[in-house]
Regions:
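A conserved amphipathic terminal alpha-helix motif
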Residues: 125-154
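Structural signal for well-ordered, non-membrane alpha-helices
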Residues: 24, 34, 83, 140-143, ...
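Tryptophan-centric aromatic hotspots in well-structured domains and transmembrane helices
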Residues: 27, 88-90, 139, 143
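Well-ordered alpha/beta subsegment
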Residues: 117-121
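Hydrophobic ligand-binding cavity/cleft-lining segments
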Residues: 1-43
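Hydrophobic beta-strand positions in extracellular immunoglobulin-like domains
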Residues: 16, 123-125
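Short, surface-exposed helix/turn micro-motifs that flank interaction/cofactor sites
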Residues: 24-25, 76, 111, 140
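Hydrophobic-ligand binding "helix-grip"
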Residues: 34, 39, 47-53, 58, ...
């Protein structure tokens, strides 16, 4: 069983040309977060983050094909600028009033590498392989936008 869970947990690592404090703050300051969160082609329509252990977050977006999605979760660990952990689940049809789907956990570590930051994200375990791969693509696109945001605001 553990082997299945391991193949359905993403591990992504990227080096960002910014200090751990700047990268961490891009995750926890709402007006910064909305500028890069979600992959290209998705417009954030609503975002609320209450970054503290036990605090909630939710985000609603619209993709190019007109599909609305909504996700939400709870912050579990907030250790600036070292670690961030929160739960994650999608809502059916982009409606917060509808039940949440399969819940996963997002764990992020921020490590100084000179004046840069190595960010490692673990997200999962997912219910199936298509969901795992879809989130891999989503995080990859979001990280590209985060990189551009950090460059633009340096």
């Amino acid at each position: 069983m553990a082997a299945v869970a391991d193949t359905r947990t993403l591990r992504l690592t990227r080096i960002f040309d910014a200090t751990p404090e700047r990268v961490f703050d891009a995750w926890i300051v709402q007006d910064r977060f909305v500028q890069w969160m979600c992959p290209p082609g998705v417009t954030v329509q609503e975002c609320v983050i209450d970054v503290r252990p036990g605090g909630g977050w939710r985000i609603k977006g619209l993709n190019r094909s007109g599909k609305v999605f909504a996700s939400s979760g709870i912050y579990v660990v907030v250790e600036r600028p070292v670690r961030l952990e929160f739960t994650w689940a999608h809502h059916s049809d982009g409606d917060y009033a509808l039940p949440r789907g399969h819940e996963t956990t997002v764990r992020i570590e921020f490590r100084a590498v000179g004046a840069k930051t190595e960010l490692t994200l673990l997200h999962g375990p997912f219910a199936d392989d298509p969901s795992t791969e879809g989130h891999r693509e989503g995080w990859g696109g979001s990280f590209d936008k985060l990189e551009a945001f950090l460059r633009r605001t340096a």
